[in-house]
Amino acid sequence: MKNFTCQCCGQCCKWEGFVIAKEDEMAAAAKLLGITLDEFIQKYTKLSQDRKSLIFADRADGACVFLSDDNRCKIYEARPWQCRTFPHEWDVPPDMQKLCPGHRLAERADATAAEALPLIHVLGHPALPMDITNAPGDAQVLNCHNFCLMLSLLGLPYIYYGCPGSKLPPGGAFVDCGKPIGKWSYRNKWHQIYNKRLSKHLAKCARLDGKPEIIASIYGAAQSDIETFGLPVIEAMVGYDHCWAPYRVFPSYAHQHTIYAQQPDFTAKNRFFDTVIPHFLDDTQYWPSSNPQDYLLFIGRDAPGKGLAVAQQAAEKTGLELKVVHNGCFGAAKTELLANARAVLMPTLYVEPFGYVAIEAQMCGTPIITTDWGAFAETVLHGLTGFRCRTQAEFVAAIRKTPQLDRNFIRDYALNHFSIKKIAPKYKAYFDFVWNVHKNGGYYADAAFRDATFL
């Protein structure tokens, strides 16, 4: 519960039940008490009735051993997750939940806060279900997933309009737009049918009650012919070669400038309301290696613009193995491959809008070697988290110098700049900004600030 604050009534610590003692939680509590884990186990735990696990001991009156006389927890800062989430995330009867005054207060506060939360209508992938396990190489499926995961983290209600088989993060509702009748291309038959379906579903799901409500387009022109019903449309995570909505979020200034140059007349109408927010990743899916190996890695599509030939030539000059992965690598296997590499090569020849692989590598603490243009100028710290190169001599020298870089610093940089937890508040601020300018005068709206820097 977002607004839960313990009222120190002691009710939950006196209820019949038991707290399972997990090793990491016992270790944290032992550290707080200034004793060893073994001492903690001996003094404060006992075997469960089925003798399969340790549970926290009880006082003589049946209350938790850590409950003080003034109804406070002696290990509150290190209390187990089981205690942190009781009773509001447990399968507890409502009449027992009502015994917790903190829970009752939080329910009222959460209900009040929910009234002000924007409802986000997420227009997803027009041809593939949102399932990153089945489409690990599709950047737009990843964008859809990450965007919804971010909304879930922010606690924002959302509705995802997508293909059958989509797997949503918690907190969202799913609207099935039906199976695609073919591949999408601009204004083809599937485009027209798809936009009609979207409009029909939006008509049913939109609140249109004056409360904050936003449409988020995650697939560009595929959704450009929808009926918006007067709601503001944000084109979020614009990494493709066009734009159509009045509010746009670019992943880099490099890509923003590219689109402004390609569509000068269209973007001039409302570029005052655009913003730049980097793409982001769930950092829990990436970890460093304690013993990295001495191979180089290239992950990317088998396309000339990805610069594979540049990577191969540079690797050959150094005599190091270059592992090449074009698709099918996902999850823990991908993270291990990234984390154990000496360096990841990403010599993209075109102006890269963002480049997820560069961020994935850095989240693993692995140096990234790129070309010196596009988004890399904004995502790679030259000489610190990797190298940005223009000649073969520079690529070769970069490969040889990567062992000198601090892999802990590289990972910390990525976590602080591209993790979902760091980026989510930027999107929330932009949602508030868009609703404000949409409802209150556009450019001249009071307090039309995209972020807290102006406050």
Residue ranges, per PLM feature:
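Catalytic cores of nucleotide-sugar-dependent glycosyltransferases that transfer UDP/GDP/TDP-activated
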Residues: A114-L455
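Short loop/turn segments that flank or connect secondary-structure elements
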Residues: M1-A116
